[in-house]
Amino acid sequence: MSKKSQDLTETQVSSRNVFDGELLHVYQDKARLPDGKVKVREYITHPGAVVIIPLLDNGELILERQHRYPLHRDFYELPAGKIDQNEDPLSCAKRELLEETGYVADSWRYLATLHPCIGYSNEKLIYYLATGLAFREANLDDGEHLEVFTLPLITALEWVNAGKITDNKSVSGLFWAEKVLNSNW
């Protein structure tokens, strides 16, 4: 970039809360664009979530099968969960791993923060690699039903390629895991 970067900032003119749900909040704002025009911007606020890549000593990953109501089908996923208000993301990751899978980890490594839907949400996903796993006991949240199983990373990646794993957060996490475990990152 040899030229000076253009200011692309959009400035909020007004904001209207359209919907307040238990998890999501929808807003419709008017924003002033860099050229001075005012346009409507609609977006969803989300508290953020953690995604855990739990790696067993034998090299297999812990995954979950869970029904997702919006798409009316089961999905294969990495363990994950919503960050509670004022909760530290690593504390959330530890809590979610234990609640959903029954495992605790001796070692935690931050991998990345990704924004899965930047065009309409402020949601962020914070990824951790969990190793040194030991089983305790799962304690699912009320209304949460899932099946926990293990799978080699190579098989999980084959499932991605075959379209059997399509969940965005899990696909991203599996690709991160492959890079990290192959010492490429």
What are the roles of these predicted feature ranges?
Residues K39, G48-V51, L56, K82-N168:
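Unchanged
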Residues A49-R73, E77:
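A glycine-rich, hydrophobic loop/mini-helix early in the fold
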Residues E10, S14-V51, D57:
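Acidic, metal-coordinating catalytic segment for phosphate/diphosphate chemistry
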Residues L157-W185:
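Long hydrophobic alpha-helical segments typical of transmembrane helices together
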